[in-house]
Curated annotation (Swiss-Prot):
InterPro entries: PSP94. It comes from the Eukaryota. Residues 1-20 form the signal peptide. Belongs to the beta-microseminoprotein family. This is Beta-microseminoprotein. The gene is MSMB. The keyword Zinc-finger does not apply. Keywords: Disulfide bond, Secreted, Signal. The keyword Secreted applies. One of its GO terms (cellular component) is extracellular region.
Length: 114
């Protein structure tokens, strides 16, 4: 029974990670353009097959034909919203959930959404 439960937990984690919110942007190249790089929305250039993290907490990858960026932010949804509040820590790209009356005390979280 424990093996079955452990397998379910691993499967649920995998499904959650696979549902990450991603955006796709064409890597615009022009005839005769032999550069092997992508230009992101801020105008920064990245080599083909390179990866980087944006200021908006996205993990991006440069491919020949597109740039794919996926959010790194997991949003807590399974917590006591009457007793607790979520706080976004931009420098860490994550939320924490703390008690409203005592922000030094964290709250348990049952569910996250990517």
């Amino acid at each position: 029974m424990n093996v079955l439960l452990g397998g379910f937990v691993i499967f649920a984690t995998f499904v959650t990670l696979c549902n990450a919110s991603c955006s796709f942007m064409p890597n615009e190249r022009f005839p005769g353009d032999s550069t092997r790089e992508c230009t992101d929305l801020k105008g920064n250039k990245h080599p083909i097959n390179s990866k980087w993290q944006t200021d908006n907490c996205e993990a991006c990858t440069c491919y020949e034909t597109e740039i794919i960026c996926c959010t790194l932010i997991a949003t807590p949804v399974g917590y006591d919203k009457n007793k607790c509040q979520r706080i976004f820590k931009k420098e860490e790209c994550k939320y924490i959930v703390v008690e409203k009356k005592n922000p030094k005390k964290t709250c348990p979280i049952d569910q996250w959404i990517l």
